[in-house]
Amino acid sequence: MKLLSKVMILALAASMLQACNGPGGMNKQGTGTLLGGAGGALLGSQFGHGKGQLVGVGVGALLGAVLGGQIGASMDEQDRKLLELTSQRALESAPSGSNIEWRNPDNGNHGYVTPNKTYRNSTGQYCREYTQTVVIGGKQQTTYGNACRQPDGQWQVAN
């Protein structure tokens, strides 16, 4: 399970970094595929034990990657900016368990960020667990992660 947590964190980090990338960065479909695969692997890991659990991870990752790629292909730059701004606001000041919503009025895509448990990591940084849910073209995708507050006040996915 620790390996899966690391994979999930890396996938979320790649996604958040994508929001800052210029034209040479990963495209939105690639980001969706990465996030979907990681989310599917996490979900698949909840089933079975031993080799059965590995099969669950593999199947979940594959199905999640396909669905995530389709959703990512439909998520535009404005969607990603709205998600990033909402994530920062939710992690900084929203009470645990509250949904902080975003909506792109141009295409109807929307979602919400739900901050959860707040804790201090081994270096003393404030960190939060969170859930991000997006609905793109009527299809919902949910990811889970941890982020820590940086000295400049920005929240960054924990690695």
Curated annotation (Swiss-Prot):
It is a lipid-anchor. Pfam families: 17kDa_Anti_2, Rick_17kDa_Anti. Keywords: Cell outer membrane, Lipoprotein, Membrane, Palmitate, Signal. Its main location: membrane. A lipid is attached at C20 (N-palmitoyl cysteine). InterPro entries: Anti_2, Gly_zipper_2TM_dom, Surface_antigen_Rickettsia. Belongs to the rickettsiale 17 kDa surface antigen family. This is 17 kDa surface antigen. It comes from Rickettsia typhi (strain ATCC VR-144 / Wilmington).
